[in-house]
A protein has these predicted regions:
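Beta-sheet repeat architectures centered on beta-propellers
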Residues: 1-79
Length: 79
């Protein structure tokens, strides 16, 4: 997605809650970064600092009963 902003932007922060361990893959214009996220009662906050126009986020969890919720992205861009 370009999140409705059709210009280059930087993903500075990504927060997500998960009750079990997962892997989060973030793609920016085809460039991939992977993060191991531990499950817990508080949201995990990742600092990907990825620049691009289009982003894709993938969640991989292999445990039974995994819950992934409340993703929060922080983007920076300039007009």
């Amino acid at each position: 997605s370009d999140f409705g902003i059709h210009k280059e932007k930087t993903l500075t922060s990504f927060g997500v809650y998960t009750n079990k361990d997962i892997t989060v893959s973030i793609f920016a214009d085809g460039v991939k970064k992977q993060f191991a996220v531990k499950g817990g009662v508080k949201p995990a906050v990742l600092k990907p600092y990825m620049r691009g126009t289009k982003f894709k986020i993938r969640f991989d969890g292999r445990a039974d009963g995994v819950v992934i919720a409340a993703p929060k992205l922080t983007l920076e861009y300039y007009e």
